[in-house]
């Protein structure tokens, strides 16, 4: 039974622990008082302004609905614009076979982060070990890249 029950050690309260308890009690009382005053003020303001909300509800409800619709419309327009810019850049790349001018990429990065062309691959890091005195063989020359064939022009409308 001695293992399950631990003996409580009695000790005398020090001045520091008594002072800490008194200050903590005062702080908790002050915070509780501030909380009560805040709750009472909120309830009083709610009671005082409720008639105004009832009287002006024919104006406030449509204004809230209009604000919501305007916000939704602006968000939809922004999304459609960003999508249009992305599609135009994709068409430009497909038609010309080259990247769009850097100005468009900068604008696109501001509109849609991460949607602009991916950066070119960085060169590989140098090996950690010291290089050999002389390479065993010379690296093979890279074949010249052939230009991409241009697609046929779309028919005129």
Curated annotation (Swiss-Prot):
Region span, Hydrophobic: 21-138
GO cellular component: membrane; monolayer-surrounded lipid storage body
Keyword 4Fe-4S: no
Domain of life: Eukaryota
Tissue-specificity statement: The full-length protein is found in the tapetal lipid bodies of immature anthers, the proteolytically cleaved C-terminal product is found on the coats of pollen grains. Highest expression is in microspores entering and undergoing mitosis. No expression is observed in male-sterile plants, green tissues or roots.
Membrane topology field: Multi-pass membrane protein
Transmembrane segments: 22-42, 45-65, 72-92
Keywords assigned: Lipid droplet, Membrane, Repeat, Transmembrane, Transmembrane helix
Localization, UniProt: Lipid droplet; Membrane
Region called Disordered, residue ranges: 137-157
Annotated Sequence repeat ranges: 119-122, 123-126, 127-130, 131-134, 135-138, 139-142, 143-146, 147-150, 151-154
Annotated region described as 9 X 4 AA tandem repeats of P-[AR]-[AP]-[AKP], given as residue ranges: 119-122
Region (Polar): 2-20
Bias kind Pro residues: ranges: 138-157
Functional description taken from the UniProt entry: Many of the major pollen coat proteins are derived from endoproteolytic cleavage of oleosin-like proteins.
Name of the molecule in the record: Oleosin-B1
Lineage: Eukaryota, Viridiplantae, Streptophyta, Embryophyta, Tracheophyta
């Amino acid at each position: 039974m001695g293992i399950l029950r631990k003996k409580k050690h009695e000790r005398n309260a020090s001045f520091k622990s008594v002072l800490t308890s008194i200050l903590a009690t005062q702080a908790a009382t002050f915070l509780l008082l501030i909380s009560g005053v805040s709750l009472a003020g909120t309830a009083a303001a709610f009671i005082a302004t409720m008639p105004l909300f009832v009287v002006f509800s024919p104006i406030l409800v449509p204004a809230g609905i209009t604000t919501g619709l305007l916000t939704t419309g602006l968000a939809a327009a922004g999304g459609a614009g960003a999508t249009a810019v992305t599609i135009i850049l994709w068409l430009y790349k497909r038609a010309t076979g080259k990247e769009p001018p850097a100005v468009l990429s900068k604008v696109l990065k501001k509109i849609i982060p991460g949607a602009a062309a991916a950066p070119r691959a960085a060169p590989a890091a140098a090996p950690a070990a010291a290089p050999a005195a002389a390479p065993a063989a010379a690296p093979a020359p890279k074949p010249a890249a052939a230009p991409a064939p241009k697609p046929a022009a779309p028919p005129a409308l």
